[in-house]
Amino acid sequence: MKYRFQYIESVPSLPNAAMVRGSFVHRVLELLLARAAQDRTLDAVRKDFEIAEGEFRLRDDFRLLLLDATSEADFWESCRECVRAYYRIEQPATANIVELEKWVSTPLGEFELGGFIDRLERDDRGLVVSDYKTGAPKPLRFSTDYLRQLTYYALMCETQLNETPHSVRIYYLGGGKDEHTRDERVVTQAVTGATLADVRDTARRVFGEIEAGKSSGEFATNVTNLCNWCDFKQWCPAHGGDIAQALSAGTERVALRRREAGLPEKS
């Protein structure tokens, strides 16, 4: 159903602080790790933080948060704490980075699956597909969905790079100061033939369901706790909403926020 709201109905959505913080911290670490290993110093990351902050202050998603002075200060401090957490779990000079923000794709019958890998690294066993999460650490049993998403990228690497990553890995950077050990913050799962087959089959099934939904106009709903964070919940039929109102109401909601932020209306 979320696919329908985003790509069929084209209902615009609003950013939230967690989303923007995640994008910002990714950008800081992208700038840092793009440097030569010996140049990934504390002075460098401070400079990269300033560069990213300058970029984000001009971005619509940051401006649409409408942060007051106190909330803005809290936002930047939460970003700094995520970067500090990164340094508590990894010395950046030791990271063997293969690619950052690399586009990969793979054909699946008549469909194509593609996306950007945030961080592709190499250790003594081979490639690892990695990502950062700026939320609090979750144990392996509760990180399944995140790791599954990364396994799709491992599948794409197998096709495009002719090398299958041996693991997928999440670096959790949220959750406060010194409250979590490195083992809690770095969660790794092996990539196996079974996990690759599982995501391949799932992708084909989902693509088939999307095509069927496009033809019939009917998209299945999947009610979970994540619905509470969905920007389209108020219009979702599973929650008593009216899809017919979504585009006009969503467009007006975003237009109002843009006016409040002093941004020009989108054509």
Where are these regions (language model features)?
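Charged, glycine-rich intrinsically disordered N-terminal tails and low-complexity linkers that flank
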Residues: M1-L31, S267
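Glycine- and acidic
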Residues: Q6-S13, L64-L65, Y132-P139
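Short, polar/flexible loop-turn hinges at active-site or ligand-entry regions and domain interfaces
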Residues: E9-A18, R35-R40, P139-F142, G217-F219
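Conserved phosphate/pyrophosphate-binding and hydrolysis machinery centered on Walker-type P-loop NTPases
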Residues: L14-G22, L65-W76, A220
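Hydrophobic (often cysteine-bearing) scaffold residues that line and stabilize catalytic clefts
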Residues: A17, R21, V25, F75, ...
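A non-catalytic, helix-rich entry segment at domain boundaries
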Residues: V28-L100, P107
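Mg2+/Mn2+-dependent nuclease catalytic core
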Residues: V98, K102-V199
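Metal-dependent nuclease catalytic regions and adjoining charged, substrate-binding loops involved
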Residues: C157-S267
